[in-house]
Swiss-Prot record:
Family classification: Belongs to the CISD protein family. CISD2 subfamily.
Principal place of residence: endoplasmic reticulum
Record protein name field: CDGSH iron-sulfur domain-containing protein 2 homolog
Gene3D superfamilies: CDGSH iron-sulfur domain, mitoNEET-type (3.40.5.90)
Gene name per UniProt: Cisd2
Cofactor(s) listed in the protein's UniProt record: [2Fe-2S] cluster
Pfam family, one: zf-CDGSH
Length: 134
């Protein structure tokens, strides 16, 4: 407890009072490289506290964080379908090809069915893009 008291009562105030904070706007332009380096640690601490507060209290940040933790690839496209499959007719394809949209295929860009296991684990409905010759 004594070390914490020493930190709060003596060390931290001395550190903050010795920071090269200029008195005017023009003073910021006169700071040396060493002075700018001395200002980096407190700036990082303030930015970290601000970012933590943003994540804790901003509803948009909370929604974005919870959406990425779901493990889903597809969070909004045709969610009412059990599997999203698009067929595109292209004359240059020899017969037909299935292209991966889940980024989990070992044979990417071709689909190897990896989305099936992904869909079971996450409840997602992603499927391949099937391209066939007409």
């Amino acid at each position: 407890m004594e070390s914490l008291s020493q930190l709060v009562k003596s060390t931290l105030p001395n550190y903050l009072s010795n920071l090269p904070i200029p008195d005017s706007v023009g003073g910021w332009f006169k700071l040396s490289f060493k002075d700018w380096l001395a200002l980096i640690p407190p700036t990082v601490v303030v930015a970290g506290i601000g970012y933590t507060g943003y994540l804790a209290f901003c509803p948009a940040a909370q929604a974005r964080c919870s959406a990425t933790k779901s493990g889903r690839c597809n969070n909004q496209i045709r969610k009412h379908e059990p599997k999203v499959v698009d067929t595109i007719d292209v004359e240059d394809i020899a017969d037909k090809a299935a292209f991966c949209r889940c980024w989990k295929s070992k044979n990417w860009p071709y689909c190897d069915g990896s989305h099936g296991e992904h869909n079971k684990l996450t409840g997602d409905n992603v499927g391949p893009v099937v391209v066939k010759k007409q």
